[in-house]
C-alpha cells in the first residue's frame, strides 16, 4: 500500500492524494455474492428527503458481507483482497474447506493464501473470529457484535479497532476508538486484530467531482439561504447568523447531544465525551 501525490496537471489534481494498493484484485467481484442496489438519493418510501446531500453517483453493486462468521471449525483460505465501493475498508474473498465462498472485512496484515478460522477453538490470530469469552483480556479486536448472533456492528471502518479491557460475569468491557467504554455480552463474537486499509484517512479528494462520483451532493450554508429555508437565512448582503449555530430545524449543533436511547444507556460504562 502506497500514498501517491498526483502531479499538478490541473487545479483538480493539484491537491489530490491517492492510496494505491497493488495487492487488490483487478478483475470483477464474485458474482454470487453481489446484490442490486438502487439509488435512493436520500429519500424514504414517501419520497421525502431524510438524508440531505445525497444523490447521483456511479452505479454500484452491494457486496454481501459475512458479519456473523458462524462457520465454526471449518478452515477458510483467503483467495483475494478486493475494493468495496460501499465502505472504507477493503474486503477479502475467503474459500471454506466445504467449497463455500464468502466476503469478510479484510483485517490488517491478512494476506492472500492465509488460513482463517472461526469458533471458540480458533487460535488467537489476526482475522480469526471467536466469542468474547474466549478472547484474552487486552487483545485488539474489531467487527464486534452488540447482540449474540446479530452480526458485527462496531469497529468495521478502515483502520478502526477496539480493546477488550475486562470480563465480569456475563459481560465484557470494550474500549472503542472514540474513547467510549461499552459493555458487551461475552457470547458476542469479535474478530482479532484491526481493520485494514488504515491509510484511508490520508487520502485527499482533490476536486468536487470526486465526491459527486460517490453520490455526495454539495452542502449549502444556512447563511446563504432565505429565512424560510434556514434559521440563519436572510439579511441584506453578507450577514452573520445572529444566533448560536443550529440545524435547519432549530436543533443546536457543534456539541449538542441528541442521544435519546435510554434503553441501552446501561451498556455504556464511560461516554466518549470528556464532560
Curated annotation (Swiss-Prot):
GO-annotated molecular function: rRNA binding; structural constituent of ribosome; transferase activity
Pfam families, sorted: Ribosomal_L2, Ribosomal_L2_C
First and last residue of the signal peptide: none
PROSITE patterns: RIBOSOMAL_L2
Region (Disordered) location: 38-60, 224-257
GO cellular component, one term: large ribosomal subunit
InterPro entries in UniProt: NA-bd_OB-fold, Rib_uL2_dom2, Ribosomal_uL2, Ribosomal_uL2_bac/org-type, Ribosomal_uL2_C, Ribosomal_uL2_CS, Ribosomal_uL2_dom3, Ribosomal_uL2_RNA-bd_dom
Keyword line: Ribonucleoprotein, Ribosomal protein, RNA-binding, rRNA-binding
Bias (Polar residues): 38-53
Example GO biological process: cytoplasmic translation
SUPFAM superfamilies (alphabetical): Nucleic acid-binding proteins, Translation proteins SH3-like domain
The keyword rRNA-binding belongs to this UniProt entry's keyword annotation: yes
Protein family (similarity comment): Belongs to the universal ribosomal protein uL2 family.
Subunit structure of this chain's protein: Part of the 50S ribosomal subunit. Forms a bridge to the 30S subunit in the 70S ribosome.
Record's function text: One of the primary rRNA binding proteins. Required for association of the 30S and 50S subunits to form the 70S ribosome, for tRNA binding and peptide bond formation. It has been suggested to have peptidyltransferase activity; this is somewhat controversial. Makes several contacts with the 16S rRNA in the 70S ribosome.
Full protein name: Large ribosomal subunit protein uL2
Gene from which the chain derives: rplB
